[in-house]
């Protein structure tokens, strides 16, 4: 894969103010509407390539893993190991982890139709989470799948939701989006039938998808567990790589 908009490449040496300014520019350039994005049916039927993106961490390095699937079957894997130069700062994750992700995606010999990124998309203070940044850099439809809610407010409680339930996440006053804008969904991908102990995922469009389609695409990715199959496999690949490089 090649970068489509290299001017948005995250630079960890920037000041915090400059990072936030770049994120405003990214949000303005990104699209949160369906634009040449794969349909959920294409994902289910194997007519679209879906890349799961996740990371693991050593003391001073990030291990970025990408697993590409077609119809649930793995067709490609890539990774990159890159030094970490700044600490974790809420809302500025792309400046810490974006470089390793770019390196891993750039090594792919296939062109994914969708990126499924472990992290937020539009559910972000400046509407420019990791999935938005990555999707715009490569100009590929992207969706963010987060385990925790960074910002915004659920329109109703997300406690003990039945499997398959979707609850809109609305922008609040910590975000640049207008209050009440639906920026994503809490999605109960899996649930125990007798003990509702699994928390929902927080799904948001990264680039070239609307919020509703983002959830539809994640649901179409399938998987037996809470995480969609692409990011679950990327998570496992990242953990295996961490063990390999950690021993070195």
From Swiss-Prot:
Biological-process GO terms, alphabetical: DNA repair
Presence of the UniProt keyword Nucleus in the record: no
GO molecular function, one term: single-stranded RNA binding
GO cellular component labels: cytoplasm
Recorded coiled-coil stretches: none
Main location: cytoplasm
Catalytic activity: Endonucleolytic cleavage at apurinic or apyrimidinic sites to products with a 5'-phosphate
Required cofactor(s): Mg(2+)
Binding site residues for Mg(2+): 54, 118
Top-level taxon of origin: Archaea
Pfam families (alphabetical): Endonuclease_5
Protein's cellular compartments: Cytoplasm
Record EC number: 3.1.21.7
UniProt-listed HAMAP family: Endonuclease_5
Similarity remark: Belongs to the endonuclease V family.
Protein name in UniProt: Endonuclease V
Organism: Natronomonas pharaonis (strain ATCC 35678 / DSM 2160 / CIP 103997 / JCM 8858 / NBRC 14720 / NCIMB 2260 / Gabara) (Halobacterium pharaonis)
């Amino acid at each position: 894969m090649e970068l489509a908009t290299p001017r948005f490449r995250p630079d960890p040496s920037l000041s915090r103010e400059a990072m936030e300014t770049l994120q405003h520019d990214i949000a303005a350039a990104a699209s949160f509407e369906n634009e040449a994005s794969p349909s959920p049916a294409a994902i289910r039927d194997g007519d679209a390539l879906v890349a799961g993106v996740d990371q693991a961490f050593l003391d001073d390095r990030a291990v970025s893993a990408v697993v590409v699937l077609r119809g649930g079957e793995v067709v490609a894997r890539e990774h990159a190991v890159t030094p970490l130069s700044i600490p974790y700062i809420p809302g500025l994750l792309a400046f810490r982890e974006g470089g390793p992700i770019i390196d891993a995606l750039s090594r792919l010999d296939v062109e994914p139709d969708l990126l499924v990124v472990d992290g937020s998309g539009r559910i972000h203070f400046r509407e420019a989470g990791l999935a938005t940044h990555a999707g715009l850099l490569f100009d590929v439809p992207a969706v963010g799948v987060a385990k925790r809610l960074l910002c915004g407010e659920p329109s109703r409680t997300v406690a003990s939701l039945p499997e398959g339930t979707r609850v809109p996440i609305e922008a609040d006053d910590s975000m640049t989006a207008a209050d009440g804008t639906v920026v994503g969904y809490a999605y109960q991908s899996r649930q125990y039938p007798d003990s509702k102990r699994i928390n929902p995922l927080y799904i948001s469009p990264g680039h070239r998808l609307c919020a509703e389609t983002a959830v539809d695409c994640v649901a179409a990715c399938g998987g037996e567990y809470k995480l969609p199959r692409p990011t679950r496999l990327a998570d496992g690949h990242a953990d295996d790589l961490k063990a390999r490089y950690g021993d070195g």
